[in-house]
Amino acid sequence: MVMEKPSPLLVGREFVRQYYTLLNQAPDMLHRFYGKNSSYVHGGLDSNGKPADAVYGQKEIHRKVMSQNFTNCHTKIRHVDAHATLNDGVVVQVMGLLSNNNQALRRFMQTFVLAPEGSVANKFYVHNDIFRYQDEVFGGFVTEPQEESEEEVEEPEERQQTPEVVPDDSGTFYDQAVVSNDMEEHLEEPVAEPEPDPEPEPEQEPVSEIQEEKPEPVLEETVPEDAQKSSSPAPADIAQTVQEDLRTFSWASVTSKNLPPSGAVPVTGIPPHVVKVPASQPRPESKPESQIPPQRPQRDQRVREQRINIPPQRGPRPIREAGEQGDIEPRRMVRHPDSHQLFIGNLPHEVDKSELKDFFQSYGNVVELRINSGGKLPNFGFVVFDDSEPVQKVLSNRPIMFRGEVRLNVEEKKTRAAREGDRRDNRLRGPGGPRGGLGGGMRGPPRGGMVQKPGFGVGRGLAPRQ
């Protein structure tokens, strides 16, 4: 029976899932995805302030990866593209966010070129790997808070725990046959069914081991589940077809034999499996811990300076600021009556202005929209309508659900006098709330309750590697 080659997209998705799992659990094994002629570029600048040069070969790539100090990395994959390229290779482009050592998530883009390994059909290694952080290219510090994105990041990571890394020094390769779509719903790109591009199954282990694992057709457990998650029916059909034809090469069958009952994947003695795909290096998203700390304080310092300088600016030049562009202060919209404006809080950190504007356009004509993404998280913003009627319509329809799942904090825009009055009241009340009224016993619990955020931080990631 002739095996049908998986589509490039299925290969790309499976590779991305396996690669980023390894980045989280055993970054010291990443070099096995590469070969002696592989090149690796991981953003950043050298000591002279120039873009860092690429490194070549497994040894240098391993040294470079270890210099990044990847610890407890978390990755949120937003989009994966994959196309067939020369000599039966596959080009994979990944866009998402990466957090290193529980720092804020940073947007990144990574491109892999997967080349056939040659010794076995449907085996690939990473020939080229280019990684860049978005803030390094466009400036600014584009981040998302680790707490908010934790839920999305955690779920894929739990799925990714199943892949086991093969400790072969010969190089880690990716098995195309085992194409299970364990990525988040974000990865719902349509799969081009016609493309029969060879997408190797990343079986890093010796051929003998692969043959031993062939008997168990476990693909059905992983692929159908993933196919359902993919919004486009085409990927689901392809995934099912590949599963039926390639059951003997199922990555799941390999891992099911070696994984402990709990499903935890050992970091060091990783059982042989086809997970070692040389294509994805989301780890790069998380810059070395040594680099991140200096940047965050600078950003926090800038934010503090802005907050300190803003109050005096509001009074003297409200009209000038109304025309300025920026995401920090709402005073730019002073030229519009307060009755035409709405304050919007709890905005998703990746929200786009055009998307938000289209959402509120259903209530009335939006003449201006601003999002504050440079201060404390989560983001907030202001929407300005050409009339007060849309404002009242929005307020009467509260709660406002954005994307059907995010509840926005929508309030009337307060005048400066009202805001200052609220601040004075808060200062007089203090952190414990108004004195008198409620008994002392009532003040303690609320404060304690506000400290802990159930759902965030719980299971934030795997335990740090020993």
UniProtKB/Swiss-Prot annotation:
Annotated region described as RG-rich region, given as residue ranges: 410-466
Gene3D superfamilies (UniProt xref): 3.10.450.50, 3.30.70.330
GO biological process terms on file: defense response to virus; innate immune response; negative regulation of canonical Wnt signaling pathway; positive regulation of type I interferon production; stress granule assembly
Requisite cofactors: Mg(2+)
Extent of Acidic residues compositional bias: 145-157, 185-206
Residues with Asymmetric dimethylarginine modification: R429, R435
Top EC class for this record: hydrolase
PTM comment: Phosphorylation of the acidic disordered region regulates stress granule assembly. RASA1-dependent phosphorylation of Ser-149 induces a conformational change that prevents self-association. Dephosphorylation after HRAS activation is required for stress granule assembly. Ser-149 phosphorylation induces partial nuclear localization. Arg-435 is dimethylated, probably to asymmetric dimethylarginine.
UniProt-listed Enzyme Commission number(s): 3.6.4.12, 3.6.4.13
Encoding gene (name): G3BP1
Amino acid composition bias (Gly residues), ranges on this chain: 430-447
Free-text function comment from the UniProt entry: Protein involved in various processes, such as stress granule formation and innate immunity. Plays an essential role in stress granule formation. Stress granules are membraneless compartments that store mRNAs and proteins, such as stalled translation pre-initiation complexes, in response to stress. Promotes formation of stress granules phase-separated membraneless compartment by undergoing liquid-liquid phase separation (LLPS) upon unfolded RNA-binding: functions as a molecular switch that triggers RNA-dependent LLPS in response to a rise in intracellular free RNA concentrations.
InterPro entries the UniProt entry points to: G3BP1_RRM, NTF2-like_dom_sf, NTF2_dom, Nuclear_transport_factor_2_euk, Nucleotide-bd_a/b_plait_sf, Ras_GTPase_bind_prot, RBD_domain_sf, RRM_dom
Assembly with partners or alone: Homodimer and oligomer. Component of a TAU mRNP complex, at least composed of IGF2BP1, ELAVL4 and G3BP1. Binds to the SH3 domain of Ras GTPase-activating protein (RASA1) in proliferating cells. No interaction in quiescent cells. Interacts (via NTF2 domain) with USP10; inhibiting stress granule formation by lowering G3BP1 valence. Interacts (via NTF2 domain) with CAPRIN1; promoting stress granule formation by lowering the saturation-concentration of G3BP1. Interacts (via NTF2 domain) with UBAP2L; promoting stress granule formation. Associates (via RG-rich region) with 40S ribosome subunits.
Principal subcellular localisation of the protein: cytoplasm
GO cellular component: cytoplasmic stress granule; cytosol; nucleus; perikaryon; ribonucleoprotein complex
Domain NTF2: 11-133
GO molecular function terms noted in the UniProt entry: ATP binding; ATP hydrolysis activity; DNA binding; DNA helicase activity; DNA/RNA helicase activity; endonuclease activity; molecular condensate scaffold activity; mRNA binding
RRM domain boundaries: 340-415
Official protein name in the record: Ras GTPase-activating protein-binding protein 1
Catalytic activity: ATP + H2O = ADP + phosphate + H(+)
